């Protein structure tokens, strides 16, 4: 029984999900259906939380739109998500960046992680 569940979960998981974590700036391209048309909508922001649970993995992205903070939670392996692109790697010391909700301006900045080649 356990093996069957594992097989079904692995079948439904996406293979092309990039490696990212809290503090990274990502662009999530979401399929949106308006009327009869389907289009891609980009949501760019900072990952403030990530939950790794296999098929049930999720992450939360926060951005500032017109001076107002907007957060959106995405299921990592959802068919609604067409692409996840990592724009910038952030260097943070926490797994969950909920403290950014109270911050604005310069205090909400995240240091950039320098890549080692």
Curated annotation (Swiss-Prot):
GO terms for molecular function: structural constituent of ribosome. PROSITE patterns: RIBOSOMAL_L19. Keywords: Ribonucleoprotein, Ribosomal protein. The keyword Ribonucleoprotein applies. InterPro entries: Ribosomal_bL19, Ribosomal_bL19_CS, Ribosomal_bL19_sf, Translation_prot_SH3-like_sf. GO terms for cellular component: cytosolic large ribosomal subunit. The keyword Ribonucleoprotein applies. SUPFAM superfamilies: Translation proteins SH3-like domain. It comes from the Bacteria. GO terms for biological process: translation. It holds the Pfam family Ribosomal_L19. This protein is located at the 30S-50S ribosomal subunit interface and may play a role in the structure and function of the aminoacyl-tRNA binding site. Belongs to the bacterial ribosomal protein bL19 family. This is Large ribosomal subunit protein bL19.
